Structure formats: C-alpha cells, structure tokens
C-alpha cells in the first residue's frame, strides 16, 4: 500500500517537473518570436508517456509577439526615428492634441500617451505629465494653434478656450479674450519690441555744474521756532497733593487709599485685653473680622469710634 502511494507521488513529481520545463520552453519561444513544440513526451490529455510513442501533432502553430513602433527623438535632428520593441503595433491610430501630446490606440482599445521629448509611452496622462518634468523644460505646454507655451496645464486650457467661439473681446489675429485688458496687452509674433501703450521717450538735459553745499542760514526755519510752541490741548496742571491724602484725625497717620484708613480706625476702639481675633492678621479673614455679627460683643464700640468711609 505504501509503495503504491510513493509511486504515485513520484509520478506526480515527474509530471510537475515536465510541466515546468514546458513552461520555460514556451517563455523562451515567445521571447524569440516563435513557438517550438517541446512536449514530445506529453500526451493530449495531460498524461505523461514513458515510451514516447504517442502520436505527434501534425501542425505546429507559430506565435509571433506583437511589435511596437515608437518614435524616439534625436538630439541632432528634429525628425523622429522609429524603433521597435514596445507594446504597440505600427498600424495603430495616432492622434496629436493641441498641447503636442500624441495619443496612440491599438487594436485592443488600449490608449497610450507618448512623450514628445523622448518618445516613451505611458498608460495614463498624469504619469506622462510627471515624466515630462525630468526634461527640465520651463514651459512644456504648447498650444497647437498659435504656438504659445505655458508652464502649467491650466494655463493652456484657459488659453485654448480663446481659440474657440466664445463671447468676449476678439482681436484681429483671431483670438478671443474674456477681458478687454487682456485683449489690449496681448502680444503677436510680428509685434515690435516696444511695449504697447508705453509713453514716448523724452530726453532730459542734465547739467554738470557743481552744486555748492547749502548753509544752515539758507534752510527754512519751522514755525515753532519763530512763533513759539503752543500745544493743541492744554497741559494738565497738578496741584500740590500729598501722596497719602487719607489722614487719621486721632493720630495723624496718613494712607494712600480710604480702605487703609478704614482698617486703621479699628485700632481706636479701646480694647482692654489682647484678643487674637483683633489682630491685623485676622482682620482680613472672612467671618472673624469686626464686621461679623459674632464679634460685636467681643469688640464693643467706644466713643472714639469713627464710621469708615469706603
């Protein structure tokens, strides 16, 4: 039983090796533009034959890989040259857009975009635009009608609309503009170099006479030197006011604000013994000060009490 399993496994392994060899031969034949039948020992139903006495096929089909004719630009001449070995056929349809980009379409319906500088083809227009940046061209987008070049594709699209039948300001050269200033200041190929609307050149005579320095007496004097300075608004005159105008009437101590004088007046109540609640540290505490109702009997008001004014 085990021998049968091993024999079947070896047979499958040998069949797999023959299949891989056949695939390698097929790849090489496609690469060399021809198909060579190398499965003489391979049966019709996919079963290998050890004797090799199976009947060979009568006809061998020759498969030729599709060739491509792409135009490669040359530095010496502007005329394109053909080179084969791409993915398109020479009989493909080719269309040249307004910006100079050539679009090729093969028999299967695939569209390819060809670079106008080196001839490489790409599947997408965005890939072609990204590739064209490596050629270091300042204005790669060229109009197919008037030949003007632009730096960005959006500028070319805006310019291409001027050649179409649109409402706007039309020039004698055939271009149409959206605004009057664009139509007025646009240039033609046969225009002179001077700017349109520039003023006429005038000659100015410059004297080479030596200029003497101006003395201070000849300089004009400002009005405030001769007439005096008078400000727009009258200056504020401050009276002789003390820095501490709040003065106690009992001990003549002065304070800068009324709140400080009010706290000072608490010291003239006439307490007979020391109470920590009457100290200056506890005066600012909420609920234990002199204004609290609970401290009324602890600190009786004497005849010398003065009502604080806030």
UniProtKB/Swiss-Prot annotation:
Pfam families, per database record: zf-C2H2, zf-C2H2_4
Chain spans, region Disordered: 73-102
SUPFAM superfamilies given in the database record: beta-beta-alpha zinc fingers
SMART domains per the UniProt record, alphabetical: ZnF_C2H2
Keyword annotations from UniProtKB, A to Z: Cytoplasm, Developmental protein, Differentiation, DNA-binding, Metal-binding, Muscle protein, Myogenesis, Nucleus, Repeat, Thick filament, Transcription, Transcription regulation, Zinc, Zinc-finger
Composition bias, Polar residues: 73-84
Subcellular compartments: Nucleus; Cytoplasm
Domain of life: Eukaryota
Region of interest (Interaction with myo-3), residue spans: 198-310
Tissue and organ expression note: Expressed in embryos from 1.5- to 2-fold stage in myofibrils. In larvae and adults, it is expressed in body wall muscle, and in addition, anal depressor muscle and vulval muscles. More specifically it is found in the thick filaments of muscle fibers.
GO MF: cytoskeletal protein binding; DNA-binding transcription factor activity, RNA polymerase II-specific; RNA polymerase II transcription regulatory region sequence-specific DNA binding; zinc ion binding
GO BP annotations listed: locomotion; locomotory behavior; muscle organ development; myofibril assembly; post-embryonic body morphogenesis; regulation of transcription by RNA polymerase II
Any single GO CC term annotated in Swiss-Prot or TrEMBL for this entry: myosin filament
Disruption phenotype: Disorganised A and I bands in body-wall muscle structure. Defective extension of body wall muscle connections or arms towards the ventral nerve cord. Double knockout with madd-3 results in severe muscle arm extension defects.
Function of the molecule: Probable transcription factor required for muscle structure. Its dual subcellular localization suggests that it may function both as a muscle adhesion complex protein and as a transcription factor, or work together with transcription factors, to influence gene expression. Thought to act as a molecular bridge between unc-97 and myo-3 at the M-line of muscles, possibly in a signaling role. Plays a role in the formation of muscle connections, also called muscle arm extensions, between the body wall and the motor axons in the dorsal and ventral cord.
Subunit structure and binding partners: Interacts with hum-6, mep-1, myo-3, unc-96 and unc-97/PINCH.
Free-text comment about domains: The N-terminal part (1-106) mediates the nuclear localization, while the fourth zinc finger is required for the localization to M-lines and dense bodies.
Name under which the protein is recorded: Zinc finger protein unc-98
Species per Swiss-Prot/TrEMBL record: Caenorhabditis elegans
Lineage per the UniProt record: Eukaryota, Metazoa, Ecdysozoa, Nematoda, Chromadorea
Gene that produces this protein: unc-98
